[in-house]
Regions:
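Hydrophobic transmembrane alpha-helices and immediately adjacent juxtamembrane helices
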Residues: 1-256
């Protein structure tokens, strides 16, 4: 109860609703646009790997890959939008006593709602057409951990971008390298041992691996390592958020 009151969750929900309404205002297709982008990306990769390169993917592989692409799209969209959290809401932060965490939760819920609805629809369609099976425990574990990470992405990157505007450009330019260093279109077992440390240094590798494990069998030691690293990355982002809150909050508000 105290956490809900402290973060003003009712306000966060209202802001998330407003964000969604504003995003699709005047759009004929509305919510369908949130499905179209990752779907086009999935079909492009499917054509390249399955048809041109003739990689022997099973129906389960194809279904898992489709859902991982949707998961990645959610992460990429959150990363891109996180840098504008403070600058895009400076009118609220400078005039209304609203916590940065409340704005972050609102933004996260807005993106998550689109991802989750689209993802559930895809799971249902793929399960019927391709016979996809999945582990709901790992699925919701991946989503829960990712939600915690993304909230701190918003508060940390959004705050730092006020002082260092290059961050927003760095995030956009590094999205493709980060994607290619994430085991989304390939499996961890296919990576040469000398290249594995580089892949594990990617913060998103562990989260994508846990999500992928919900739809595709992954070696147990990779799964345990992924969960451990995911918790570690969340803890690191939480500490960075606390440092910013303690050391830079006044300067942050003065800079708006």
């Amino acid at each position: 109860m105290s956490i809900s009151k402290n973060l003003n969750l009712p306000l966060a929900l209202e802001l998330a609703k407003t964000n969604l309404q504003a995003k699709y205002a005047g759009s004929i297709f509305g919510f369908l646009w949130s499905i179209l982008n990752p779907l086009i990306l999935f079909l492009t990769y499917l054509f390249a790997f399955k048809i041109i390169l003739r990689i022997p993917w099973t129906h389960q592989d194809i279904g898992a890959f489709c859902l991982v692409i949707f998961f990645w799209h959610w992460l990429a969209q959150s990363l891109t939008e996180s840098t504008s959290l403070v600058l895009g809401n400076k009118h609220l932060l400078s005039k209304v006593p609203v916590k940065l965490e409340t704005l972050a939760i609102a933004a996260v819920l807005s993106n998550f709602a689109q991802f989750f609805i689209a993802n559930i629809l895809c799971i249902l369609v793929i399960s019927v057409t391709l016979g996809l099976t999945f582990n709901p425990i790992l699925y919701f574990l991946a989503i829960s951990l990712t939600l915690l990470l993304v909230i701190h992405f918003y508060t940390v990157l959004g705050s730092l971008n006020v002082f260092f505007r290059d961050i927003q450009h760095l995030v956009v330019n590094f999205l493709t390298p980060i994607f290619l260093l994430t085991p989304a279109i390939y499996d961890l077992k296919d990576i040469p041992k000398e290249a594995l440390p580089i892949v594990w240094l990617n913060p998103l590798t562990s989260f994508v691996t846990i999500f992928k494990a919900a739809f595709k069998e992954i070696e147990l030691h990779y799964l345990i390592l992924s969960v451990s690293l995911a918790i570690g990355w969340i803890a690191l982002m939480f500490l960075l958020h606390k440092v910013i809150q303690a050391k830079m909050l006044k300067q942050l508000l003065d800079a708006l």
